[in-house]
Amino acid sequence: MLDPSSSEEEAEEVVEEPEIKEGQAPTTGTRLSPSRTSESSGGLQPSSRSSSVRPSSPSPSVVSEKEKEELEKLQKEEEERKRKLQLYVFVMRCIAYPFNAKQPTDMARRQQKISKQQLQTVKDRFQAFFNGETQIVADEAFMNAVQSYYEVFLKSDRVARMVQSGGCSANDSREVFKKHIEKRVRSLPEIDGLSKETVLSSWIAKFDAIYRGEEDPRKQQARMTASAASELILSKEQLYEMFQQILGIKKFEHQLLYNACQLDNLDEQAAQIRRELDGRLQMADQIARERKFPKFVSKEMENMYIEELKSSVNLLMANLESMPVSKGGSEFKLQKLKRSHNTSIIDMGEENENQLSKSDVVLSFSLEVVIMEVQGLKSLAPNRIVYCTMEVEGGQKLQTDQAEASKPMWGTQGDFSTTHALPAVKVKLFTESTGVLALEDKELGRVVLHPTPNSPKQSEWHKMTVSKNCPDHDLKIKLAVRMDKPQNMKHCGYLWVIGKNVWKRWKKRFFVLVQVSQYTFAMCSYREKKAEPQELLQLDGYTVDYTDPQPGLEGGRSFFNAVKEGDTVIFASDDEQDRILWVQAMYRATGQSHKPVPPTQVQKLNAKGGNIPQLDAPISQFYADRAQKHGMDEFISSNPCNFDHATLFEMVQRLTLDHRLNDSYSCLGWFSPGQVFVLDEYCARYGVRGCHRHLCYLGDLLERAENGSMVDPTLLHYSFAFCASHVHGNRPDGIGTVTVEEKERFEEIKERLRLLLENQITHFRYCFPFGRPEGALKATLSLLERVLMKDIVTPVPQEDVKNVIRKCLEQAALVNYTRLSEYAKIEENQKDAENVGRLITPAKKLEDTIRLAELVIEVLQQNEEHHAEAFAWWSDLMVEHAETFLSLFAVDMDAALEVQPPDSWESFPLFQLINDFLRSDYNLCNGKFHKHLQDLFAPLVVRYVDLMESSIAQSIHRGFERESWEPVKSLTSNLPNVNLPNVNLPKVPVTLPVNLPQMPSFSAPSWMAAIYDSDNGSATSEDLFWKLDALQTFIRDLHWPEEEFGKHLEQRLKLMASDMIESCVKRTRIAFEVKLQKTSRSTDFRVPQSICTMFNVMVDAKAQSTKLCSMEMGQEHQYHSKIDELIEETVKEMITLLVAKFVTILEGVLSKLSRYDEGTLFSSFLSFTKPGMDLADAYVTFIRHSQDVLRDKVNEEIYIERLFDQWYTSSMNVVCTWLTDRMDLQLHIYQLKTLIRIVKKTYRDFRLQGVLDSTLNSKTYDTVRNRLTVEEATASVSEGGGLQGITMKDSDEEDEEDD
């Protein structure tokens, strides 16, 4: 607190000096000090203060309208300033001495709000993170999550609007990010040893690090701690400072008012309250007498109103009475008196009931006696021991330490307690007796003091009364006696007094003004060494004032009196200052409304140089003079009962709310604890009605909310519920009277509130972006339900609430879609800034619609994520809202689709995007919009499948006509250059007059790589399988929502695949037979690559039919089983045809051997030649080559095994038949050697190819083997040369030799 004479206050005083009431001469109202008179000419006066001096009036013709307006404006500003100063006086008194309210400690702590600059800083920090300019390590998943949060939340215009409204805190940002990542983290795959909670915590920690940036967390924590403390409890000085800012009060103005109001004097503040309460009671009586009531809703409420006024004052009196008189507790609160509610002068007749006795006002004093030193000890030897004793009469005796007579110094303190208002303190000086027979020490001198609480506290020299036998007659002792003033003793001192009933003789007595309780004071006169007062006067009902000297009364210089009906007591003090202090103290005690003005002040005002305070005036008078000099006395001395506190409170509450909404907290309209405390105290002390307070608060909050500020609906709910309860007679604060103004204003507020709430629900995405503030939307819906109630008891029918919310959400759909469309256009314009003026093609329109669909889905997802919980009671309305929202999008979507060329397939991604979202939403799946979407695209899908079927059928026909049957891999060694089928463009025959149907992009089938990594089928078959799989994958990826049509599509595609594969298999079978017919019948035959390719086509057809032709339903496997059977039959036929070809070649060899049959003409000729083994070797080579090619090129092992089994069996059957036909003939040696070679090599080669022993060692083979063995034996006997090492015996050596 500034010192009144400080340089700062004086410096400001120069600027603020000319505060002169209108029409008052400067020299009379404001007297400057001599040193400043030269500055008062007005040259240095600021314009804001010069308005208080009325300028000279020019003629009407000269004064312009503008000047008049300017003058009126200045006058209004001056009136406003005065009103604020007066209001500040009332607020200061509430802060200085609260007796009704306390600063609440249970209020929710508000978060620091984010400003525009801070939001931009946060964005920059996130951008730095993306650019890699931070040290934060992050994986791709976290980067994606942060990028999404940055794009969706931080860059959102709704967040910028929330920041502008003052409702966005750092905690909101953190909570939104937490919610944003929870789904992402939950969807991540499990990692051993790493829980999802750990990942969440890590991500949040990294987010905090990004959000905080390079700022030292310790500094931030310290700042947060300090701000949190200021948000909780404020000191009186902080409260003064805050309301100076709220009301625009300058520091020096506060200092003047603070000192002049004596706010640091609790007695003065309590007295002020007593005077105010007395005034309110008198005002209540005046209203009752004059019948000047407010207009109530019922005439019967007028008498109730008076009772409520008196009851409220009684409550305040009780609160004041409960305030402790002393800080120590109840020691001096002797009794609670049964006072009536009225302390005014009028009803003091029953005072005997409250009469004090002398025992009620016993005081307790603490004394400190400090003995410093003694002077004048000359007769004692320097080494003699001296000491002092001290006592308060009637109490214990204390002694100092011993000291030598040469240095009699102690500094010893003794503490005493006494009930005597005029105690006797005795201090004695002793020396130790040296005599042998001395029984006690010798007293040298003594001093007896009678201190009072007003006595000097510092050490003083006192002359001692010397003992008779002490030679030193000039003994002096330096000591200090400090007598503390009890809390319940308000003033004391000597006064001359005379009264009618007490103190009947004019005499000087020692008086103490004692406060027994907050409402009971007594003037007590005491004698020395007495605990109880000799006489006392209870001050209830008395009025104190200054008076002139009374003739005939000798003694006393300055007179004053205490007057009561039938009694007058005259007092006189020895000086003017003491009189002023006594009058002030008694003025506080009596509770009178009249404020005594000392005669010296009136004289001083008229005296020259009167601004210099008199030497005998108290400091409080000095402050009052200074306040008067600055024009503040009117605010200090004004009677609070004469003001319309309802209007003043409305003003201070509005200004406090403005201040609160502009501070650094995201308060949402909630006052700080300190502000609540001051407003509570003001309402209680000055009788502001609770309903009026809440109506004003609601009005102010609604005004701020309507202008874009974020206001907590729970706060609105509290105030609205209070007002509703009051207006409907429920007495929430015990007040039963309801004024017409309150009722009318409540209805007006109710309607405004209803419109605001409906508007907020309509704009819920923008008023509560991302579900922030938490729970606000839910509270808004709850409040709307309360507002719609006709009274406070009958709940509103749910259907009525539902209809209101339905209407709001219908409008919300339009608002949301309109803003979304505008945003999409802005985004599009920014993207295409360089292509301004280009034509909007159907493709561009479709592209824009797809982008708009993405935004629509994003909005619906955000609604579900952030707002669905609030609408839990009305979830069906949210579904209706979503359908309405989508129906608006449907208009734009339909328009974009209408302009697309016929048979264009570019719109399928739009269907997939929307359908994938809708089918995952339980409420929207197969809803109105979803069915509309299906109706739009079903014909397109059918048309697409028709064209694909036709295209694929024709590609099969043409492909097989031109088919080379070369395997795909052997077409070229460079796979990327292979002319693979175009996934996105299954070719349609040129003869069809349609656009080429292009499939939307999708992932390649899983079997694609496997096909092209091996020597598989032909180009035509691979193209077929690719297209069939691509088509089925595409249709499957559509995820058609309607089950029946989906089954129909699947069934049709499976049937199509079955037909196509069947056609492929049959065409391959025909080509296979044709190919075989064209090949050689001799041992020169080599299995061509095309034969293997055809087999592989069968292999692929079998593999693909499992996927392309099988259905997961019951009837079902008919397509798959049918095509499987066809493939199996075809493969059997192909194997049979190929084996027949091999048998034909073997028969050709045997035909050649037949020429050597015994008895033929040809054999007789050939008997003279010696043919070699060329024929056998050629056949063996043919077998081996064919086996190797088939084994290497055909991919199905089962087919190879079946082929080799059948081939071997057929070969042996042919040989056996040939030998059986020659059963009666002996084989020619050439025949024998050739057959042995063929049979042995065939057996060996097929065994190496894996033919089973059971097949190899068949009866046919045994028959052939036995015959050849017999023939071999016969030939070895008959032929001299033998078989040249060729034998049927198993011999590895022979085999190796033959090889």
From Swiss-Prot:
The keyword Secreted does not apply. Residues 891-1068 form the MHD1 domain. Residues 347-462 form the C2 domain. Residues 488-591 form the PH domain. GO terms for molecular function: lipid binding; metal ion binding. Residues 1-77, 1277-1299 are annotated as: Disordered. This is Calcium-dependent secretion activator 1. PROSITE patterns: C2, MHD1, PH_DOMAIN. Pfam families: C2_CAPS (PF25341), MUN (PF06292), PH (PF00169). Keywords: Calcium, Cytoplasmic vesicle, Exocytosis, Lipid-binding, Membrane, Metal-binding, Protein transport, Synapse, Transport. Homodimer. Calcium-binding protein involved in exocytosis of vesicles filled with neurotransmitters and neuropeptides. Probably acts upstream of fusion in the biogenesis or maintenance of mature secretory vesicles. Regulates catecholamine loading of DCVs. May specifically mediate the Ca(2+)-dependent exocytosis of large dense-core vesicles (DCVs).
